[in-house]
Amino acid sequence: MLQHAAIAVAICALFFVLRKWVWLYALVVFPGTLAHELSHFFVGLVLGARPASFNPFPKRAGNAIMLGEVRFERLRWWNAIPVALAPLSLVPLSAMVLHESTRAPLVSAIDIALKIVAAQFLFASKPSAKDCEHAIAGAGTLIVLAATAFVCGM
């Protein structure tokens, strides 16, 4: 089991090193980016945020690269937090894929492929700065509403 974990960590380290070469990194992590954006899309769809556009492809945004984007027509205080933090749902998915990889022979093609997928999901689970902005805005509104309810209830 320790060998499996070491290989998974090495793959994650490789992804981290690839960040120096932005376009190569964007290409390598594209499957994870697709999973990240799909998580926003489907949670937004279920919660009525009305996804208006879906773009999993990287594009230049000033001096940086935006790996993907989903825009919503009805992102509100009550659905902003779950939509913004939807990529966190990829963490348990990553763990399940990593666990499944331990059933394959060590360093076999299927073992490495599953570990790469697990690393993709793990890297893709990190909310972006924009995701955090939406989550904080939604949380701020919830805090104000809770405080108002508390004060008015006294």
Give each language-model segment a name.
Residues 3-15, 58-154:
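Metalloprotease/metallohydrolase-associated module, dominated by Zn2+-dependent proteases
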